[in-house]
């Protein structure tokens, strides 16, 4: 069994690196066929005053006149050595700009994921504990409504209510000008966190509820009830233990979906993270920055799916047996 699981591990790791290479090639070629002139991103308004000779010289210096396959091979060699180039817009090393932004995305993303993981589990337990009762029906209806609201609409509603009408919370940014205290950063995190979590919370809670309700109808649960075992003991000691592996696998597979929602929330709230930086790079055709951001996002998504498959193979031996 151990050898079979190691075989699954080896195959998944090999598939991971192949997927990253294919992703880098696709993103590179797509970024090079956009209609936006990268010189506009690099020189700004000054490009309009440049002559054609100056533009050709600038393109030659940036390596934009070479065939796209040649550009890709050159970029790949530099990337493997840790050199991802200079950002056209920020005139800094790409990795330096990303390091300044990635901590904000990590804070927002990790907090959203933890709150979602715990909140959905507790909400699903509450619904299963009160199956078909008032609390269960109320949560189901409220959850159905919130899950139908797109994240950008949820973000706009939150901004309008809590920032425009009530003035309780800031509408954008990661901290106030001249601020930066822990309390100030937390106030700026509240609305993006709610927008990130609200759209996903009920989906996962509903999955937990349904799995738990189905589990409570199993034969061993019926037998336990016949022996006089308390419902709380059945739910928390027996049912939850059997549901957790499936729930962990579901949350691992959903990292990509949650990450995409976090990027969208960053763009709406003007939160200075990787999502906002990706939007700005795409808008200005900042090739080097866009390449690294898309590759970084792809690595996270592919890694999350790979880890989820490995977790499934570890928790479910039958899956490992099917891998040949």
Q: Where on the chain are the PLM-derived regions?
A:
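An internal, D/E-rich "acidic patch" concept
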Residues: 2, 64-121
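Membrane-water interface segments at transmembrane-helix boundaries in multipass membrane proteins
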Residues: 140-202
